[in-house]
From Swiss-Prot:
This is Cysteine--tRNA ligase. It is found in: Cytoplasm. GO terms for molecular function: ATP binding; cysteine-tRNA ligase activity; zinc ion binding. Its EC number is 6.1.1.16. It catalyses: tRNA(Cys) + L-cysteine + ATP = L-cysteinyl-tRNA(Cys) + AMP + diphosphate. It comes from Mycobacterium sp. (strain KMS). The gene is cysS.
Length: 481
């Protein structure tokens, strides 16, 4: 999927890979900073609630990038952070009457379970924001010393006016910038953004030279990027909704601190429903457990990865079932070859498959090559040409392995994904229902009802019975608690 005419020329980089860089608006040759090594930072989850399929699309998309780079013989350092301190986390935990750290840890586990269910490789490191307060404070001190940040009413702000090219990633003109942070009395200019939030009653806080408080979101990622990958690294990735203000503000801090930061900026498109971004605030989310009640994890992974990573993925039941059928066709062919001919070990991917992935991870074209090989293999198998059938099957295994959904991989064959997903969600639902029971014992009916309602929003129905509460996925099987 290319956006510029010159992007059609063959790759000339040592890796053979060309990627669309949001900063330049063009597909560029990817040349790592260090020969043979690639450093990637992916903005991970803000662990405020159960993951939905929109949340995990970035994990699937950039898992393919990581697998492809690794297959090319490159050593990949892949960092995916966890935002475990945030306004939404604090507010939701307070509403539920739970400690904020317990709330964050619970949903961090839920995200980890979702990534694992979808076959996303674990990151090289998965730093939590709260584990890097020291690095954040040091970064803010550098910005203050360089004249790019100032204190006000216990907070610390970044002075946007000190960077004339602010907005270069998103295309925002500096005079038109609006941070969406609301009115803050300590700000000199409403275009400025928060680096550090002064302590408030009942909120967690850490000591700093300018008083107790907690970090701003944008500061967290800069500190963690540089702690693990250094002042300059290869790729910074995330959802397209992060381009502004989050990634724009990361760039501002890093450059103001004198660091090179990311050389490529990659952004994946949203999962949409009815043309709208899948979002809890819009009420149009599909939780991972709810979807895995209808399809297998490998099928959901195939679906999420079937569109080009930069395009919008409009969710529909028809499209999901089309993906299920397409995956089944590949799976059935491999099983037929294994039954009739023998063990199928991964072989070589085709040149067209490699060319597709080298062209900004054009997975739809790569999948077309998979299905072309399947068609050739099926004809060969039906005609008794077992050698050709096996060659095609081995190639398919190699290609589907890069895409993370090889049907003969032991992770997909060795377990019942639906049962595993239900077991994982059962742990989380039990925790929520224990909280609800505590609230009912305190006669805090409002909190008890709120927990039940939030579970329902996530696709989980709770029914009170004489034997205790039962939960079920909406339109699914029930489970005693």
């Amino acid at each position: 999927m290319t956006d510029r005419a010159d992007a059609d020329r063959p790759a000339t980089s040592p890796t053979g890979l060309r990627l669309y860089d949001t900063m330049t608006g063009a597909v560029r040759d990817f040349v790592p900073l260090r020969d043979g090594h690639v450093s990637i930072y992916l903005c991970g989850a803000t662990v405020q609630g159960l993951p939905h399929i929109g949340h995990v699309r970035s994990g699937v998309a950039f898992d393919v990038l990581r697998r492809w780079l690794t297959a090319k013989g490159l050593d990949v350092a892949f960092i995916r952070n966890v935002t475990d301190i945030d306004d939404k986390i604090l507010n939701k935990a307070a509403d539920a009457g739970r400690p904020w750290w317990e709330w964050a840890a619970t949903y961090e586990r839920a995200f980890s379970a979702a990534y694992d269910a979808l076959g996303v490789l674990p990151p090289s490191a998965e730093p939590r924001a709260t584990g890097h307060i020291t690095q954040m404070v040091e970064l803010i001190e550098r910005l203050i010393d360089r004249g790019h940040a100032y204190t006000g009413d216990g907070d610390v702000y970044f002075n946007v006016a000190t960077l004339p090219d602010y907005g270069k990633l998103s295309g925002h003109r500096i005079d038109d910038v609006h941070q969406g942070e609301g009115v803050a009395t300590g700000k000199r200019d409403q275009r400025d953004f928060t680096l550090w939030k002064g302590a408030k009653p009942g909120e967690p806080s850490w000591p700093t030279p300018w008083g107790r408080g907690r970090p701003g979101w944008h500061t967290e990622c800069v500190a963690m990027c540089e702690a693990y990958l250094g002042a300059e690294f290869d790729i910074h990735a995330g959802g397209m909704d992060l381009v502004f203000p989050h990634h724009e503000n990361e760039i501002a801090q890093a450059e103001a601190a004198g660091d090179g930061f990311a050389r490529f900026w990659l952004h994946n498109g949203w999962v949409t429903m009815g043309g709208e971004k899948m979002s809890k605030s819009l009420g149009n989310v599909l939780s991972i457990p709810a979807v895995l009640q209808r399809v297998r994890a490998a099928e959901l992974r195939y679906y999420l990865g079937s569109a080009h990573y930069r395009s919008m993925l409009e969710f529909s039941e028809t499209a999901l079932q089309d993906a299920v059928k397409a995956y089944a066709g590949v799976e059935d062919f491999l099983h037929r070859v294994r039954t009739r001919v023998g063990t199928v070990v991964p072989g070589d991917w085709t040149p067209k498959f490699a060319a597709a992935l080298d062209d900004d991870l054009s997975v739809p074209i790569a999948l077309a090559e998979v299905h072309a090989a399947r068609a050739v293999g099926n004809r060969a198998l039906d005609s008794g040409d077992h050698e050709t059938a096996m060659t095609q099957a081995r190639s398919i295994r190699a290609m589907m392995g890069i895409l993370g959904c090889d049907p003969l991989d032991e992770r997909w064959e060795s377990r019942d994904e639906t049962s595993a997903a239900l077991a994982a969600i059962d742990v989380l639902v039990r925790w929520a229902l224990d909280s609800r029971a505590d609230a009912r014992n305190r006669k805090d009916w409002a909190t008890a009802d709120q927990i039940r309602d939030r579970l329902k929003e996530a696709g989980i129905e709770v029914t009170d019975t004489a034997d205790g509460p039962q939960w079920s996925l909406l339109d699914g099987d029930s489970k005693d608690v």
